[in-house]
């Protein structure tokens, strides 16, 4: 359980296809647009966590190389779609993942894993390199800008 002021590590997947489009989804909890992301579990590395989170949230297994896009600092207020009751700082580890598999243009996946998201239906689509970032909260916008610069 998160303690007040305790830093929580997160891993964020920036999966791009051959066109440079980025995999994003609409979160049904608040209708915001997001990237696959989640908490690094005890004993887990951010590298392992980003692969697990992508699989849990999208159903996509990614075994390819990870390219670090650095980290982002974020303060997470209590409440919201993350289901936290305690405000806390977060450190997001961002990874670029280049898909070599053909994936559908749009698809839905029922999330597994965390109690807050288990059973939620996420609607995925690909975000074009020049698409506006309306609907994304600031940390996701920052992650997308980094991913776009690296592609």
Show which residues each predicted segment covers.
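Short, charged/polar surface micro-motifs in flexible loops or helix N-caps
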Residues: 16-22, 30, 41-42, 74-77, ...
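A short, polar/proline- and glycine-enriched secondary-structure boundary/capping micro-motif
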Residues: 33-37, 116-118
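Short hydrophobic/aromatic beta-strand or adjacent loop that forms the aromatic wall/cage
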Residues: 8-12, 90-94, 121
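Active-site-adjacent beta-strand/loop module that shapes the phosphate/pyrophosphate-binding cleft
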Residues: 74-111, 125, 130, 143-148
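The catalytic Nudix box helix
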Residues: 35-71
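Short, cationic low-complexity segments
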Residues: 115-126
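A generic structural signal for short beta-strands and their flanking turns/coil linkers
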Residues: 29-31, 62-64, 70, 89-93
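N-terminal strand-loop-strand
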Residues: 1-35
